[in-house]
């Protein structure tokens, strides 16, 4: 993986391929490359390690022409083999060029087979296996490129997508979609394909989303699609509302900072049209969901990464407000063990991108079980998760470019809180909690704005952390998962090893890590757990730990040489998880900047993880 672009046109397409790659960089990358069939029907390929601008400079310095009307391009995030030019895509076998996302699980067996046919491998990738296999099948058994790709697809096992180009058939691309997303962009005398519609927004506003098992034949004037049963089929065309403007930083130096400061607006957009006169109502959940909601006795949430941390917060809420038992599953574990799903369960799938392979596998897996209903909560309107779910709740945070989740995390929590209120409303239970959520959630954007004002206080702490190798973050109640999310942000954006713990668990092993060189961040709010958290602070102080407290202004702490206190504005207890993550996001950002980390594109990470 990570990003595919392909174009068939009547005009030269080099600049559009490069633009597409630039729009895919946010998904994660370590190298990039492109191949075009030039105006003499010769296959021209170039690959480089690093950012797309490294590839652009190399193309400018090359004497050979990369002008052509058919081409493919790719940004790579390494899964098989290190980031090298040989491992970058496209991969070439004679007249065949292939770009690929996903993993071919039986590539070692196929590699051995191809070596016996005297094929030589220049890379460590599973993608080169596909290129050689298509070349071998084409030469051995003949047929159109479409027929050859169909036959080869039956030899491959895994979740993947590919786009194939043949210099002997210069006006056609063949795409296959087996669990990893591909989107066709429709143009005039030009058609395109990509793994993300952002790559094609400068070419089209009209898209076809391929379904699992689809194989598509793309020319500059026609699209033909076959489904997994090899039936020729028409797929719906969708007109997107996404604008290229979202891909701009505005007055901010980094997308990460921009997205942190966009959170009040993102939350307002998530609340829009969902606040009625005196209650919260999610129109997406009308009809069958509202009729069956009375049968729900259990909640199961499935998520990865930051979405898993937001699910952890919501567990407290589901049990406290809706009186429903709740458990949380890591998607990558959920699919590979014997699972038990109660027939009176509501299943909730959380994803920022809606393309995370583990989440999609989990969603597809549960369809064979007996349960009441499933819902997805997602930020990407036209994603695979949205299209495959029974019902979806969109968070409307706007496109998030930085790899580290910020506004999608807080809007996801907002959506979960609204869902809980909606369930209480339909079931006619806990009117007080409904009122509390209704009143609090409307002032959440304002509370986030106030929390952003602590940026200067947070910035003063940066040098105390930037040279540290380890950081411990603790919290109680809903602040425990926020401590975990804060630790994840530090890992991602500053490369500091950080761990979030439940404060009460310190004495069960973590106290052994406390020393004068390990900062301990303590998240404190004024609630019934305050006294216990204060006791934990004393435990750390007595062992010489360096303590950094983030707490509401009204809480008093005795002065101590090894304690630093950052005072936070008042926030309602219900809104503490969404509000308290903000200073942690800011701290992670400023430490990353101090350490000269590429905070928008941290090393080794991808925004959209399309492999399991």
From Swiss-Prot:
Keyword Hydrolase: no
Any one of the GO BP annotations: protein N-linked glycosylation
Catalytic residues identified in the record: 2 (nucleophile), 607 (for fru-6p isomerization activity)
The keyword rRNA-binding is assigned to this record: no
UniProt-listed Enzyme Commission number(s): 2.6.1.16
Location relative to the cell: Cytoplasm
Start and end residues of each Glutamine amidotransferase type-2 domain: 2-221
Any one GO CC term of the record: cytosol
Single GO molecular function: glutamine-fructose-6-phosphate transaminase (isomerizing) activity
This protein's UniProt keywords: Aminotransferase, Cytoplasm, Glutamine amidotransferase, Repeat, Transferase
Coiled-coil annotated residue ranges, if any: none
Residue ranges constituting the SIS domain according to the UniProt record: 289-429, 461-602
InterPro entries: GATase_2_dom, GFAT, GFAT_N, GlmS/AgaS_SIS, GlmS/FrlB_SIS, Ntn_hydrolases_N, SIS_dom, SIS_dom_sf
Reaction(s) the record says it catalyses: D-fructose 6-phosphate + L-glutamine = D-glucosamine 6-phosphate + L-glutamate
Complex formation: Homodimer.
HAMAP family, sorted: GlmS (MF_00164)
Family annotation (PANTHER family): GLUCOSAMINE--FRUCTOSE-6-PHOSPHATE AMINOTRANSFERASE, ISOMERIZING, GLUTAMINE--FRUCTOSE-6-PHOSPHATE TRANSAMINASE (ISOMERIZING)
Listed NCBIfam families: glmS, PRK00331.1
Function recorded in the entry: Catalyzes the first step in hexosamine metabolism, converting fructose-6P into glucosamine-6P using glutamine as a nitrogen source.
Annotated protein name in UniProt: Glutamine--fructose-6-phosphate aminotransferase [isomerizing]
Organism: Wigglesworthia glossinidia brevipalpis
Gene encoding the protein: glmS
């Amino acid at each position: 993986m990570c990003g595919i672009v392909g174009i068939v046109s009547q005009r030269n397409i080099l600049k559009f391929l490069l633009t597409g790659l630039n729009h895919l960089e946010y998904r994660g990358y370590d190298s990039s490359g492109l191949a075009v069939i030039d105006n003499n029907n010769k296959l021209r390929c170039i690959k480089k390690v690093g950012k797309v601008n490294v590839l652009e400079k190399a193309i400018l310095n090359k004497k050979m022409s990369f002008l052509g009307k058919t081409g493919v391009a790719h940004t790579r995030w390494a899964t098989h083999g290190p980031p090298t030019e040989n491992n970058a895509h496209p991969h070439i076998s004679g007249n065949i060029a292939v770009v690929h996302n996903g993993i071919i699980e039986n590539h070692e067996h196929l590699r051995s087979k191809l070596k016996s046919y005297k094929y030589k491998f220049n890379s460590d990738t599973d993608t080169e296996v596909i290129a050689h296999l298509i070349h071998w099948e084409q030469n051995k058994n003949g047929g159109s490129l479409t027929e050859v790709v169909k036959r080869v697809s039956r030899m491959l096992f895994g979740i993947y997508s590919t786009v194939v180009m043949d210099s002997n058939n210069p006006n056609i691309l063949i795409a296959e979609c087996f669990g990893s997303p591909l989107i066709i962009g429709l143009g005039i005398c030009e058609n395109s394909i990509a793994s993300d519609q952002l790559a094609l927004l400068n070419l089209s506003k009209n898209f076809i989303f391929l379904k699992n098992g689809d194989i598509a034949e793309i020319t500059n004037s026609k699209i033909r699609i076959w489904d997994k049963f090899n039936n020729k089929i028409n797929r719906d065309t969708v007109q997107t509302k996404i604008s290229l403007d979202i891909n701009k930083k505005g007055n901010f130096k980094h997308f990460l900072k921009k997205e942190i400061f966009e959170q009040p607006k993102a939350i307002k957009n998530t609340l829009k049209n969902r606040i009625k006169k005196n209650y919260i109502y999610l129109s997406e959940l009308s009809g069958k969901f509202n009729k069956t909601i009375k049968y729900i006795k259990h909640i199961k949430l499935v998520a990865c990464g930051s979405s898993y941390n937001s699910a952890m917060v919501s567990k407290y809420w589901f049990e406290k407000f809706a009186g429903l038992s709740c458990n949380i599953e890591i998607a990558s574990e959920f699919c590979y063990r014997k699972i038990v799903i109660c027939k009176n369960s509501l299943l909730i799938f959380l994803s920022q991108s809606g393309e995370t392979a583990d989440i999609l596998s989990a969603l597809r897996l549960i369809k064979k079980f007996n349960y009441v209903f499933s819902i997805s909560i997602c930020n990407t309107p036209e994603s695979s998760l949205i299209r495959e779910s029974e019902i979806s709740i969109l968070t409307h945070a706007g496109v998030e470019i930085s790899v580290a989740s910020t506004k999608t995390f807080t809007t996801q929590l907002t959506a979960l809180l609204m869902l809980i209120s909606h369930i209480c409303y339909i079931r006619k239970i806990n009117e007080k909690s409904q009122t509390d959520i209704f009143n609090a959630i409307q002032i959440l954007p304002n509370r986030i704005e106030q929390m952003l004002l602590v940026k200067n206080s947070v910035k003063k702490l940066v040098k105390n952390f930037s040279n540290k190798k380890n950081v411990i973050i603790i919290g109680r109640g809903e602040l425990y998962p926020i401590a975990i999310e804060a630790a994840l942000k530090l890992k991602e954006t500053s490369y500091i090893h950080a761990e979030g713990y439940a404060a009460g668990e310190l004495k069960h092993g973590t106290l052994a890590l406390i020393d004068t060189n390990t900062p301990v961040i303590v998240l404190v709010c004024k609630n019934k757990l305050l006294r216990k958290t204060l006791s934990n602070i004393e435990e750390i102080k007595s062992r010489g730990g360096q303590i950094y407290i983030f707490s509401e202004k009204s809480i008093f702490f005795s002065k101590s040489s090894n304690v630093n206190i950052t005072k936070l504005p008042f926030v309602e207890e219900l809104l503490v998880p969404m509000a308290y993550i903000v200073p942690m996001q800011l701290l992670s950002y400023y430490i990353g900047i101090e350490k000269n980390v590429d905070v928008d594109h941290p090393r080794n990470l991808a925004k959209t993880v399309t492999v399991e």
